[in-house]
Amino acid sequence: MRVAVDAMGGDNAPGVEVEGAVAAAREFGIAITLVGDTEKVNCELAKHNCKDLDITVKHASEVVGMHDSASDAVRKKKDSSIRIAFELVKNNEADAVVSAGNSGATMAAGMFVLKRIKGIDRPAIAQIFPTLRGKTLVLDVGGNVDCKPLNLVQFAIMGEVYARSVMDVENPKIGVLSNGEEESKGNDLTRESSTLLKSTSLDYMGYVEGRDIFNGMVDVVVCDGFVGNVVLKLSEGLAEAVSTMLKEEIKQSLLYKIGYILSRRAFINFKKKVDYTEYGGAPLLGIDGVGMICHGGSNAKAIKNAIRFAHEYARKGVNQHMVEKLQENYPLYMQQLETLKAQAAG
C-alpha cells in the first residue's frame, strides 16, 4: 500500500513533510509518494539518506494556502498538491492521503475527487483525545458547522467502526455531547439525535458532558462541527497553558526543580499522552477513500504518525466495514425518524 503526502501543505512545508515521510518509510516500511513542487521536494529529500526507501515524487504546480477558500482546491487550483494527492487515490496509484494543509480544502478535495461512501450525507473530521482510561474519538471537530440529527447518527456509526477497527476497542460505547446527562437537557439536535441512536444496534450510552470526554466514559463522542471545533481548540489551548504554567512554577524554587528532576519520567509520560503528534492527524471519515488531516503546525513526528495511521486505516478496509454498518442500521433509524415525523404532524 502507498500513502500520498501533500508535501506543500502546512506551515513548514515541504521540510517537515519530507522528513516525516522519510521517517515513516524507514521505521514502518511504508511506500510513499510526495506530491508537490518537484524541485523543492527533491531538494529536501537530498538532505536525508533515502537509499532503499520506496519514496517517489509527483509534481504539482499549485498550492492551496491556509487563507484560500475550500473551493479553490476543487475549482480553481486543479493542479494543487492536495487535489493531485486525492487523484492518485482515485486512479489507484495510492491508497491514502495525508495533508497538513488547509483542512477545509482537504475535505472539499476529498469529497470532490473521491465522493462519499454509500449511506453518508456528510463526511466528518474525527480526533482522538487522551483520557484517564485510554482514548476517546470525537467527531465532528470542524467539518460541518450545522448538522441535522441524521448526520450525528451517521457520525456515530462511522466513529464506532473506526474505534473498533483502528483503535482496537472491542465494543465501543457511544455518547452525544450535551450540556448535561439528563434526557431533558440539550437542544433539538441532540434530543432527536439521541432518540434515533437508541433505535440503532450501537451501544449508545446517552448524553455525555464535556468533562466526560477525558474521563473515558465512552469511546466515541458525537457532536456538530461547531461544538466539536470549540472542544478541540479549547483542549489544545488548555494543554499549552498548563504546560507553560507548570514550567513557570518549577522555576520559582530550587526545591521545585529538584522535585521535577525526581519526577521527570512521570512528566515525560504525561507529555506523551497529551501530545497531539503521537496521534498524527485527524481522520476524514465518510469519503470513499482515506484522508488524514494534520495540524498546520505539525512537525515531522506528527507527519510520520499520520502516515502510519493512514496506512493502517487503508490496510484494514475500514470504509467497507462502515458501509456494512450503515446498511445494517439504516432501516432502524429511518423507521424511528418516520415515527418522529408522524408524532410531530399529529
UniProtKB/Swiss-Prot annotation:
The UniProt entry's GO biological process terms, in alphabetical order, are: fatty acid biosynthetic process; phospholipid biosynthetic process
The record's section on InterPro entries has: FA_synthesis, Phospholipid_synth_PlsX-like
Any one GO CC term of the record: cytoplasm
Pfam families of this UniProt entry? Answer: FA_synthesis
- Specify the domain of life of the species encoding this protein: Bacteria
The record lists the catalysed reaction(s) as:
a fatty acyl-[ACP] + phosphate = an acyl phosphate + holo-[ACP]
- Where is this chain primarily localised? cytoplasm
Keyword annotations for this protein? Answer: Cytoplasm, Lipid biosynthesis, Lipid metabolism, Phospholipid biosynthesis, Phospholipid metabolism, Transferase
Subcellular localization? Cytoplasm
The UniProt GO MF terms for this protein read: phosphate:acyl-[acyl carrier protein] acyltransferase activity
User: How does this chain assemble?
Assistant: Homodimer. Probably interacts with PlsY.
Q: Which PANTHER family match?
A: FATTY ACID/PHOSPHOLIPID SYNTHESIS PROTEIN PLSX, PHOSPHATE ACYLTRANSFERASE
**Function, in words:** Catalyzes the reversible formation of acyl-phosphate (acyl-PO(4)) from acyl-[acyl-carrier-protein] (acyl-ACP). This enzyme utilizes acyl-ACP as fatty acyl donor, but not acyl-CoA.
The similarity annotation says: Belongs to the PlsX family.
Please identify the protein, giving its name as recorded. Answer: Phosphate acyltransferase
What species was this sequence derived from?
A: Geotalea daltonii (strain DSM 22248 / JCM 15807 / FRC-32)
* Organism lineage: Bacteria, Pseudomonadati, Thermodesulfobacteriota, Desulfuromonadia, Geobacterales
Gene for this protein? Answer: plsX
